[in-house]
Curated annotation (Swiss-Prot):
Organism annotation: Xylella fastidiosa (strain Temecula1 / ATCC 700964)
Keyword field contains ATP-binding: yes
Region of interest called NMP, as start-end residue ranges on this chain: 30-59
Protein name, UniProt field: Adenylate kinase
Molecular function in Gene Ontology: adenylate kinase activity; ATP binding
Homology family: Belongs to the adenylate kinase family.
SUPFAM superfamilies listed in its UniProt record: P-loop containing nucleoside triphosphate hydrolases
Complex formation: Monomer.
Domain comment in the entry: Consists of three domains, a large central CORE domain and two small peripheral domains, NMPbind and LID, which undergo movements during catalysis. The LID domain closes over the site of phosphoryl transfer upon ATP binding. Assembling and dissambling the active center during each catalytic cycle provides an effective means to prevent ATP hydrolysis.
Example GO biological process: AMP salvage
Length: 187
C-alpha cells in the first residue's frame, strides 16, 4: 500500500506514521529525515541540499524529488510506503505522481489528519514549553498553520478530485486515531 500522510504541524503525522509502519509492515519515509540523512551521508544530492541550506534557502523541489526517487528505488518499498512531509504544494504533488508513474506504482490513498486550529496551537505550544522553545508562541504557531493551509489546500483538492483522499479526525488518543485511520484504509 502506497500512502501519503498529510496534516498540519502538531496533527500527529509522525506519531501515526510510526504506528502505521508497525501495523502495515511498510516503511515510513519522512522527507525531513531523508534530507538530514542525505546531508550527513554526503551524497551528491545531500551536498547540494547542504549548500542551499547554508545560504538560508529552502531546498528545491528538484533536490527533494531526487532524494525521494533514490529512496523509492530501495527494495523495502516494494510492498508500499508511508510518505510524510511531501507533497507540500501542488507542483510537488504533480511531481510525485510522475515519479510513481515511472515506477509503475501510483498512490493508493492520501490520509488527511484533521485537527482544529485551537487544538493544534495547544499541542505545539505545550510541546514547545516542555522542550523550552520560546519561538513557538501561539501567534507564531497560528502563522505557521496559515502558511501550511495556504500551500496545502490545493494538494488536498488535487487528491480529493482523484478520489483517493481519506479525511480522518486526528483528535483523540493515539489508539483512537490509529483505529480511525485503519477503518478509513479498510485494514
Amino acid at each position: 500500500m502506497r500512502l501519503v500522510l498529510l496534516g498540519p504541524p502538531g496533527s500527529g503525522k509522525g506519531t501515526q506514521a510510526a504506528q502505521m509502519q508497525e501495523t502495515l509492515q511498510i516503511p515510513h519515509i519522512s522527507t525531513g529525515d531523508l534530507l538530514r540523512s542525505e546531508v550527513v551521508a554526503g551524497t551528491p544530492l545531500g551536498l547540494q541540499a547542504k549548500q542551499v541550506m547554508a545560504q538560508g534557502d529552502l531546498v528545491s523541489d528538484a533536490i527533494l524529488l531526487g532524494m525521494l526517487e533514490s529512496r523509492l528505488s530501495h527494495t523495502d518499498v516494494v510492498k508500499g510506503f508511508i510518505l510524510d512531509g511531501y507533497p507540500r504544494n501542488l507542483s510537488q504533488a504533480a511531481a510525485l505522481d510522475g515519479l510513481l508513474a515511472k515506477f509503475g506504482h501510483p498512490l493508493n490513498a492520501v490520509v488527511q489528519l484533521e485537527v482544529p486550529t485551537d487544538v493544534l496551537v495547544e499541542r505545539i505550544a505545550g510541546r514547545a514549553q516542555a522542550e523550552g522553545r520560546e519561538d513557538d508562541t501561539p501567534d507564531a504557531v497560528r502563522k505557521r498553520l496559515q502558511v501550511y493551509n495556504d500551500s496545502t489546500a490545493p494538494v488536498i483538492g488535487f487528491y480529493q478530485q482523484r478520489g483517493i483522499l481519506l479525511r480522518v479526525d486526528g483528535v483523540g488518543r493515539l489508539d483512537e486515531v490509529s483505529q480511525r485511520i485503519a477503518v478509513a484504509l479498510g485494514c
